[in-house]
Amino acid sequence: MSYFPWLTILVVLPIFAGSLIFFLPHRGNKIVRWYTISICLLEFLLMTYAFCYHFQLEDPLIQLKEDYKWIDIFDFHWRLGIDGLSLGSILLTGFITTLATLAAWPVTRNSRLFYFLMLAMYSGQIGLFSSRDLLLFFIMWELELIPVYLLLSMWGGKRRLYSATKFILYTAGGSIFFLIGVLGMGLYGYGSNELGLDLERLINQSYPATLEILLYFGFLIAYAVKLPIIPLHTWLPDTHGEAHYSTCMLLAGILLKMGAYGLIRINMELLPHAHYLFSPWLVIIGAIQIIYAASTSLGQRNFKKRIAYSSISHMGFIIIGIGSITNIGLNGAILQILSHGFIGATLFFLAGTASDRMRLVYLEELGGISIPMPKIFTMFSSFSMASLALPGMSGFVAELVVFFGLITSPKFLLMPKMLITFVMAIGMILTPIYLLSMLRQMFYGYKLFNVPNANFVDSGPRELFILICIFLPVIGIGIYPDFVLSLSIDRVEALVSNYYPK
């Protein structure tokens, strides 16, 4: 047992080191860039070391626990700990943030603030995935919003203020329900004179049926905004259409996954009876979302928005996996969280770099750019294939495991299972249609248009490095998913066994 405060260091290091950026000498952006990338790398290496040497995969309990009294007056503790559910998400956060920092190399305007906000976001995300106290979870959830809002409103497209305001209104609106749920849970357990927010205690807490359903619904609204679940998804295409591509990488790669993580960590673990009641609805919503977002994506002219809708469609698989209440389904949802984290982030990075070079985002104005930009074309095609679940890539394995999870679920009858599977299959047919038509309109054809001031430069070594770094895990998970599944499999088994008592 290691008593070294690994997780506290992992949570606090980025934001503290980030605040020192403002004291660096004003000699261009070079120092700031190298400083930020080295902080991200150091954090990622520390994380990998701590998990390799101090985390036992076979143990389904919480590990690397830390508990420090913080605010004595209402018994608020700084409680951290990780298990198989959060391990993959934390590693994904470290990986994507490091590459997003490298992707933000061309940012020169207010670069100190930009990099500080990215590091602040990093701290918030790792704090969220490792917190073991409900109030701390909520604080980290909120801490995330401020950097994202500033990154959107200061570095973005023409309508950036509109999309940033829309984002903050949606997420803050969802957070109100979250806070009510947190207070309701804390006050119910310990009478009205003190709050009990320790997740370990709350797991064994039982609630009256009506209260549990109300709490579940409150949390669900907050996660439905983040995840996003239709009809609370409309902030996402606007945000992705306007944000700088390194911000998009963090949004698609990590921010959306926080909603899925909260759904598993709080709704499934702490409110099992309500989740058992709501799970058929989750599966139905997930299936509708896959088809709805895929068909909406087909009608988008802006290719960034088209990729944003494909993100929403892929989140449907996570919702179905969580709603299936089976070992296989939940493992599939966790696999899809990681798989889409890699694929979604890269597609936005590619879309951003391509639109920066061409200064165009509408598909009908594009065509024939595969000739001047063969590397971007190759990588765009490869990641589109990964997104449409080509066998041998991570998207295929994740969706297949979710399928099996739904089919083997003892909770649903045969007819509903067949119906949902049929709907999912239609969604999987629509995915290649909108992705391949986007590729055709962008890269094929003869319109080597004469755009003034467009510099058709193919991707340089820095961009290729980012793309190859993400391509390797996508292929790796596709060929040998067991490595990722072994992180969460024991924890998931312990969680699902609560639903089907022996």
Swiss-Prot record:
Q: Which GO terms describe its biological process?
A: ATP synthesis coupled electron transport; electron transport coupled proton transport
Compartments where located: Plastid, Chloroplast thylakoid membrane
InterPro entries tied to this protein: NADH_Q_OxRdtase_chain4, NADH_Q_OxRdtase_chainM/4, NADH_UbQ_OxRdtase, ND/Mrp_TM
Keyword match Nuclease: no
Superkingdom of source: Eukaryota
Q: Which Pfam families does the protein's record reference? A: Proton_antipo_M (PF00361)
Q: One GO molecular-function annotation for this sequence?
A: NADH dehydrogenase (ubiquinone) activity
EC number(s) for this protein? 7.1.1.-
Give the enzyme's main class according to its UniProt record, as a single word: translocase
- TM annotation in the entry: 4-24, 37-57, 87-107, 113-130, 134-154, 167-187, 213-233, 244-264, 274-294, 315-335, 336-356, 388-408, 419-439, 464-484
What protein family is recorded?
A: Belongs to the complex I subunit 4 family.
> What PANTHER family does this protein's entry cite?
NAD(P)H-QUINONE OXIDOREDUCTASE CHAIN 4, CHLOROPLASTIC, NADH-UBIQUINONE OXIDOREDUCTASE CHAIN 4
HAMAP family attached to this UniProt entry: NDH1_NuoM
Q: How is this protein named in the record?
A: NAD(P)H-quinone oxidoreductase chain 4, chloroplastic
